[in-house]
């Protein structure tokens, strides 16, 4: 029998064991954060089980007929996932407030909210339009401590991304994978359906310094700002400069595209356009958590002109452009966006 002591990065340990091992390293830990992470993983298991029945049972595919705060048609899966997160945290006193893509205002989840208590910020199902065609989707989350100096619930959550306690996503694909950081590296856990547990499969994920792939929706190229267009043209002409050619990859599911970029290197872009320079992705529950993961893995995340984690949100559902991935490609994209690099010349 192997009696080697478990550490937080022992491959094959469960997410629960990992969290408890991390907690043991902090003498001031109360167990609240550990409990919170376990409940997120429970929500993920429930959503994963529901997704596995898509097409076999009612109210997984298709629309509810309602419209959310974003002005988007609500899908059954969006509604189920949102209600699942609410259900697993309600009356636990682990989370005081829940912010969701599906809710206009913060939702109080506990009557007992001491100063500094946690808030959970989520996109319950990112890329839900893809489930009808059996493409990967994800839940994205961010854990914050409420600002005790704030005068109301909303302003208590409008914090820079550097203040996140933890961030992560659960990718529902060929398998279900829980990826998170609490600013101690990025770790990935794969759901073992037989055990019903997330098991450490990708300890200490590091993004390559430079990659071979770029990911962007080329259908919007006519609407890109000049810096974005010049950057993508530059990548496309790598071979003419005697460099290794880049390949394009685009799933159309944000967390899935970022996950691939995290593992293989390169860059993902969801830029602003001439008509919508402020972009489409939401800062608090899409850009901020993914940016923290990228930076903890050695990558970078920017709007094209500003570091994502330095942005102070003005509203709960604020939108931003997103450029995220390997340091080399992100720095290059930023140089083009700022006009510091403007021309594409063979051999440059």
UniProtKB/Swiss-Prot annotation:
Residue positions binding Mg(2+) 1: 101, 123, 125
Keyword Cytoplasm: yes
CDD domains tied to this protein: FBPase (cd00354)
Gene3D superfamilies (UniProt xref): 3.40.190.80, Fructose-1,6-Bisphosphatase, subunit A, domain 1
PROSITE patterns assigned to the protein according to its UniProt record, in alphabetical order: FBPASE (PS00124)
Pathway in which the depicted protein is active: Carbohydrate biosynthesis; Calvin cycle
One GO cellular component, as annotated: cytosol
Positions that bind Mg(2+) 2: 123, 126, 286
Chief location: cytoplasm
Catalyzed reactions: beta-D-fructose 1,6-bisphosphate + H2O = beta-D-fructose 6-phosphate + phosphate
Quaternary structure and interacting proteins, as annotated: Homotetramer.
Name of the protein this chain belongs to: Fructose-1,6-bisphosphatase class 1
The species this protein was found in: Gloeobacter violaceus (strain ATCC 29082 / PCC 7421)
């Amino acid at each position: 029998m192997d009696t080697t002591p478990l550490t937080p990065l022992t491959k094959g340990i469960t997410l629960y064991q990992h969290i408890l091992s991390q907690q043991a390293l902090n003498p001031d830990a109360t167990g609240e954060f550990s409990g919170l992470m376990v409940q997120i993983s429970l929500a993920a298991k429930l959503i994963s089980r529901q997704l596995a029945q898509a097409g076999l049972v009612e109210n997984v595919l298709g629309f509810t007929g309602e419209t959310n705060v974003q002005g988007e048609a609500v899908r059954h899966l969006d509604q189920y996932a949102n209600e699942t997160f609410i259900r697993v945290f309600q009356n636990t006193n682990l989370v005081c407030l829940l912010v969701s893509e599906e809710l206009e205002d913060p939702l109080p989840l506990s009557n007992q909210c001491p100063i500094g208590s946690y808030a959970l910020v989520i996109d319950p199902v990112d890329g839900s339009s893809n489930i009808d065609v059996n493409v990967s989707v994800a839940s994205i989350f961010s854990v914050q401590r409420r600002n005790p100096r704030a005068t109301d619930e909303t302003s208590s959550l409008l914090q820079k991304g550097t203040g996140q306690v933890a961030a992560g996503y659960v990718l529902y694909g060929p398998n279900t994978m829980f990826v998170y950081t609490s600013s101690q590296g990025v770790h990935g856990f794969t759901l073992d359906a037989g055990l019903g547990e997330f098991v450490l499969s990708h300890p200490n994920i590091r993004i390559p310094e430079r990659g071979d792939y770029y990911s962007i929706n080329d259908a919007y190229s006519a609407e890109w700002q000049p810096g974005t267009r010049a950057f993508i043209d530059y990548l496309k002409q790598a071979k003419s400069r005697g460099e290794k050619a880049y390949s394009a990859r685009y799933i159309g599911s944000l967390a899935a595209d970022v996950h691939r970029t995290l593992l293989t290197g390169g860059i993902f872009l969801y830029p602003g356009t001439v008509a919508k320079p402020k972009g489409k992705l939401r800062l608090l529950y899409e850009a901020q958590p993914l940016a923290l993961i990228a930076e903890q893995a050695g990558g970078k995340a920017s709007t094209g002109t500003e570091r994502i984690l330095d942005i102070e949100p003005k509203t709960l559902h604020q939108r931003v452009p997103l450029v995220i991935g390997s340091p080399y490609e992100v720095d290059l994209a930023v140089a083009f966006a700022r006009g510091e690099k403007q021309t594409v010349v063979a051999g440059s």
